């Protein structure tokens, strides 16, 4: 066995020399050098310093400016809330534990940290699914003159939470479990063992199929259809140049969000799947820690992408930060750019 399993942990280090200790009780400096734990703490501090202000600002600016409260923005705000869950429920905890070299909050704290980190990641994934469906319904028009309105956005937000809880809650009630991972300073789903006592194998399969593969299939299908429809509409000049530009800007923004999500989460999911399907494989703590670095960066990129690619939101943010004045003098964007969900790009 290339790892050491305890009642509520799995340390990726053989205990032949007898040095392995519970990650809830002793520093894990036999897994990595102390300076590496310090680097992990510094990275968590950076994510907190960047992640909290930018996501909080996203929420605050939307509350301050009524024009931003569009159905599409409800989903984007949901992403900001998910990111804040990751900041407060995950990053702050990992910062503190990495400074101590082990998970000082015990199994209960591990459950809470793992729950919030998983919840935030799943809300983000399912929010991207809802955004993909919204873009598909609005642009491709599979249901004639359907309009994506406030009630649909609220139902979409509700769906993201239901599906996220369906993934994050089971380990708390006996289906799988949360355990320290990587350098043992943060917690996640147990990908390392089969653990029949908690039916871990069935849960991991369920999670990869329902909460990763299916969402990815939906997203790629929607955007495949969307790209084809937009190209056909542009070729036939079925819409005004202004409407086409507005649709393309929103669609481009959402597609970039999906690409960023894949860059952040696919390495983590791939490594987790590899570990799970290669039980007994000899891997070190850094093998899982590095992909987790990419995954945790997800709390920053969504609001950055939105601010950079949405002129109306960017203008409102600058106005809010500058006490009601915009020193850049940007003109207000047209209604078509802020309410693209009602446009009429016809299907090919």
UniProtKB/Swiss-Prot annotation:
Site (Plays an important role in the conformation switch to the active conformation): 113
Residues with lipid group (S-palmitoyl cysteine): 322-323
Cytoplasmic side: 62-73, 134-152, 225-252, 309-348
Modified positions (N-acetylmethionine) in chain numbering: 1
Pfam families (UniProt xref): 7tm_1, Rhodopsin_N
Post-translational modification note: Phosphorylated on some or all of the serine and threonine residues present in the C-terminal region.
Residues annotated as transmembrane: 37-61, 74-96, 111-133, 153-173, 203-224, 253-274, 287-308
A GO CC term assigned to this protein in UniProt: photoreceptor disc membrane
Positions annotated to bind Zn(2+): 201, 279
Membrane topology: Multi-pass membrane protein
Residues with the Phosphothreonine modification: 340, 342
Motif ('Ionic lock' involved in activated form stabilization): 134-136
GO molecular function: 11-cis retinal binding; G protein-coupled photoreceptor activity; metal ion binding
Residue ranges that the UniProt entry lists as topological domain Extracellular: 1-36, 97-110, 174-202, 275-286
PTM-bearing positions, type Phosphoserine: 334, 338, 343
UniProt keyword Phosphoprotein present: yes
Protein purpose: Photoreceptor required for image-forming vision at low light intensity. Required for photoreceptor cell viability after birth. Light-induced isomerization of 11-cis to all-trans retinal triggers a conformational change that activates signaling via G-proteins. Subsequent receptor phosphorylation mediates displacement of the bound G-protein alpha subunit by the arrestin SAG and terminates signaling.
PANTHER family assigned: OPSIN (PTHR24240)
Name of the protein in its database record: Rhodopsin
Organism: Pagophilus groenlandicus (Harp seal)
